[in-house]
Amino acid sequence: MGVTKKPDLNDPVLRAKLAKGMGHNYYGEPAWPNDLLYIFPVVILGTIACNGGLAVLEPSMIGEPADPFATPLEILPEWYFFPVFQILRTVPNKLLGVLLMVSVPAGLLTVPFLENVNKFQNPFRRPVATTVFLVGTLVALWLGIGATLPIEKSLTLGLFSIK
């Protein structure tokens, strides 16, 4: 490594940078080539070696072995498709289900036009965007949990009954 230069606090350039909050990297070791050529590859190769070692020493199965003669009772999609699956499962008309799925990104595209986002950075000062996010998250969680239940309990999550 190189010789580390001590900061001179009487230096006017350093004082100006410190006043702006930019003086932390003015003196000391440079990031190039010390960090980028020597330290980062060691960290990356060490991470790969640790993952490879764990995979060799403690292999884990990725699901059950395939059995073509045993079909599951209910076939479910991957977890990230649960809300879409629930919409298609509960809506009786296929066209209406597809329109509901298309309305989600279409509704999200209208949010910037409903509210001036450049004006405020705090999410609590953007009530439309915050409300759309919170309601969308709750609906997605509700639909995702409901997709794992039988169709009779899927809309209410079994909390109450609809007759």
Swiss-Prot record:
| One annotated GO biological process | photosynthetic electron transport chain
Protein topology in the membrane: Multi-pass membrane protein
Transmembrane domains' residue ranges: 36-56, 95-115, 131-151
Q: Which UniProt keywords apply?
A: Chloroplast, Electron transport, Membrane, Photosynthesis, Plastid, Thylakoid, Transmembrane, Transmembrane helix, Transport
Q: What is its main location?
A: plastid
InterPro entries named among the record's database cross-references? Cyt_b/b6_C (IPR005798), Cyt_b/b6_C_sf (IPR036150), Cyt_b6/f_cplx_suIV (IPR005870), Cytochrome_b_C_euk/bac (IPR048260)
An example molecular function term from Gene Ontology annotations: oxidoreductase activity
Give an example GO cellular component term for this record: chloroplast thylakoid membrane
Compartment(s) where it occurs, according to its Swiss-Prot or TrEMBL record: Plastid, Chloroplast thylakoid membrane
Family from the record: Belongs to the cytochrome b family. PetD subfamily.
Quaternary form? The 4 large subunits of the cytochrome b6-f complex are cytochrome b6, subunit IV (17 kDa polypeptide, petD), cytochrome f and the Rieske protein, while the 4 small subunits are petG, petL, petM and petN. The complex functions as a dimer.
Q: What does this protein do?
A: Component of the cytochrome b6-f complex, which mediates electron transfer between photosystem II (PSII) and photosystem I (PSI), cyclic electron flow around PSI, and state transitions.
Name this protein carries in UniProt: Cytochrome b6-f complex subunit 4
State the organism of origin: Pelargonium hortorum
